[in-house]
């Protein structure tokens, strides 16, 4: 099932972007036609990284730094890649604290002081998992598809904990949505 969902904060990512400037985008999730079409209006390089297909991302017992190694293997970006926009969607609802720390350790060298990010969290920890795939259809609208199967590892974090975990980002704005999710706008804090 596919639906369109309004976004209160997505347009803020693009308000200071010059359509003629080069843009580098990290999209966590599969490459969907709506997102590719949306970004075709910009001079940009899209990096699609479907970490959702790797879930659950957990440390291997008795293997030191196994999470760091897993993310280093999954996130092999070309040297000199710096993301202007990161689209995390609801990834952090499916990652434990250690996995988030390792993910950010690997991502941080690819951020710059002007990097911005967008994502979703939950307002109520008892909120059911969304199990959705997101694509950008317009500056203020997302195309949302229901996943065929439930994602493993759903364990959302409260917003206060997420602010601590996402140490290389500052929470600029968050908006409570009707389904008790939080839409978040983040900026790099390096």
Label the predicted regions:
Residues 1-17, 25, 32-76, 116-190:
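Class I (Rossmann-like) S-adenosyl-L-methionine-dependent methyltransferase catalytic domain
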Residues 35, 99-100:
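Residues at alpha-helix caps and immediate loop-helix transition turns in enzyme cores, especially N-
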Residues 86-87:
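Hydrophobic beta-strand segment of the Class I
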Residues 91:
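Hydrophobic adenine-recognition pocket in adenosine-nucleotide-binding enzymes
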Residues 94:
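A short His-aromatic
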Residues 101-116:
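A short glycine-rich, Lys/Arg-flanked "PGG" loop and its adjoining helix->strand segment in the class I
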């Amino acid at each position: 099932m596919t639906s369109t969902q309004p976004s209160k904060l997505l347009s803020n990512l693009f308000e200071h972007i010059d359509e003629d400037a080069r843009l580098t985008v990290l999209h966590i999730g599969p490459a969907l036609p709506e997102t590719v079409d949306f970004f075709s209006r910009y001079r940009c390089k899209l990096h699609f990284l479907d970490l959702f297909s790797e879930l659950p991302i957990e440390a291997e017992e008795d293997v030191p730094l196994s999470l760091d190694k897993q993310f280093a293997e999954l996130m092999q970006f070309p040297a000199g890649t710096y993301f202007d926009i990161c689209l995390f969607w609801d990834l952090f609802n499916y990652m434990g604290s250690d996995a988030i720390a390792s993910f950010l350790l690997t991502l941080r060298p690819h951020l710059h002081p002007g990097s911005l990010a967008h994502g979703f969290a939950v307002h109520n920890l008892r909120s059911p998992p969304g199990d959705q795939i997101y694509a950008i259809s317009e500056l203020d609208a997302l195309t949302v598809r229901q996943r065929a199967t439930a994602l493993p590892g759903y364990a959302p974090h409260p917003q206060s904990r997420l602010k601590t975990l996402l140490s290389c980002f500052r929470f600029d704005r968050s908006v409570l949505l009707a389904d008790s999710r939080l839409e978040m706008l983040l900026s790099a804090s390096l």
